[in-house]
Design a protein with these regions (language model features):
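A domain-level signal for the structural core that forms small-molecule/cofactor-binding pockets
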Residues: 1-192
Length: 192
């Protein structure tokens, strides 16, 4: 369900490092999906790498390492369906991605490592995710990866979207605005 994009300096993932990091980050993605190591979960666990030339990556107005902490510049964007993660879950992702990169490219025993590993979690608004040319909801993604809708995690998801439906209704949003789970019916938006 999440997509992870890794931007890294040219030449910093030599040899088997990229493949090793891809595997570690795939493990992070599966952890994010609640351990969904199912065919559906694996199909949604996408890691993309973009190598950036040194002359195209500026920090503090410079392209060298003057303002860069070891193990170097890394920017990771993690796209997740809106409403899937609370603040604690996102903090777990920040820590796990940083650890994977420092473990493979730096010195994990040095507490100063990883300050230049930037991890940004982006919530993709419900209704903006698609596959096979169709819009898919977070509920459909949960079904695909085998995430139970009876557990605490999905209870939080339902509470999040129920509150959002009430907010939309109170603000007078049109019922077909989008951004709500299919189970949050148009009637719920109108009645709020």
């Amino acid at each position: 369900m999440p997509v992870l994009q890794v931007y890294y300096p040219q030449g910093s993932l030599q040899g088997g490092r990229k493949a090793a990091l891809a595997q570690r980050l795939t493990d992070v993605l599966l952890m994010m999906e609640g351990g969904a190591k199912t065919p559906g979960g694996m199909a949604f666990a996408a890691v993309l790498f973009t190598e950036v030339p040194a002359t195209d990556w500026w920090v503090g107005g410079r392209t060298d390492a003057t303002y860069v902490a070891p193990p170097g510049k890394f920017l990771i964007r993690v796209d997740i369906p809106e409403g899937y993660m609370n603040r604690s879950h996102k903090s777990d992702v920040h820590a796990a991605v940083n650890k994977a990169i420092v473990d493979l490219t730096g010195d994990p025993s040095d507490p100063k490592q990883g300050a230049s590993v930037l991890v940004i979690v982006n919530d993709v608004t419900e209704g903006n995710w698609g596959a096979r040319g169709r819009t898919i909801s977070l509920a459909a993604i949960a079904d695909s990866v085998g995430l139970a809708k009876t557990g605490e995690r999905f209870k939080w998801v339902r509470n999040y979207f129920a509150a959002k439906a009430r907010q939309f209704g109170a603000a007078g949003y049109p019922p077909d605005t989008g951004g709500l789970l299919p189970s949050e019916s148009e009637a719920e938006v109108r009645s709020a």
